[in-house]
C-alpha cells in the first residue's frame, strides 16, 4: 500500500519524504506501507479541490495535522490519468457508492483540462457508471447514462 504526501507549503520536501518513507525504506519494512512525496503537478485536480479536503488530526498522527483529498477529487484525478489501475479504483468507488456519476459530472467543468479532454472525461464517467449498472450494481440517479 502506498500513500502520496504533498507538502503544500514546502513542495521541496517531496524528495525528503520519498527518501525517509519511500518504497523499500526502513519505514516501509516496519509498517508495511510507504509514502511517495508528490508535487503540485503530480495529479490533475478540480480547481477548487482545497475547499473539500478532510482534516486528519488525532493520537495516531501525534496530533499533527494532515489533509486528505476528497474522494470525488481523487476519482476525477484518477479518471483523467486513465491507467488500468486507476480505472479499477474508480470502478470500485462507483460500485460501493462512494461517488455518484451526477456528482462527478458536475465537477468536470472545474477540471483544468481542455474542452476535448472534458468531453472525454464525461464519456468515461458515464461509460464506467453504465458498466457498473449493467452488471447489477445500483447506480442512483443514473437516468443520464442512457443518453
Predicted features, each with a name:
Residues 1-147:
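Compositionally biased terminal segments of proteins
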Amino acid at each position: 500500500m502506498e500513500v502520496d504526501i504533498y507538502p503544500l507549503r514546502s513542495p521541496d520536501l517531496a524528495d525528503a519524504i520519498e527518501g525517509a518513507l519511500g518504497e523499500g525504506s526502513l519505514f516501509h519494512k516496519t509498517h508495511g506501507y510507504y509514502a511517495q512525496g508528490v508535487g503540485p503537478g503530480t495529479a490533475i485536480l478540480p480547481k477548487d479541490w482545497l475547499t473539500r479536503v478532510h482534516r486528519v488530526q488525532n493520537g495516531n498522527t501525534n496530533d499533527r495535522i494532515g489533509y486528505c483529498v476528497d474522494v470525488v477529487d481523487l476519482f476525477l484525478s484518477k479518471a483523467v490519468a486513465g491507467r488500468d489501475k486507476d480505472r479499477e479504483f474508480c470502478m470500485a468507488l462507483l460500485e460501493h457508492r462512494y461517488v455518484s456519476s451526477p456528482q462527478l459530472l458536475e465537477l468536470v467543468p472545474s477540471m483544468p483540462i481542455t474542452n476535448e479532454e472534458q468531453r472525454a472525461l464525461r464519456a468515461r464517467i458515464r461509460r464506467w457508471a453504465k458498466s457498473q449498472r449493467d452488471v447489477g450494481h445500483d447506480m442512483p440517479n443514473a437516468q443520464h447514462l442512457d443518453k
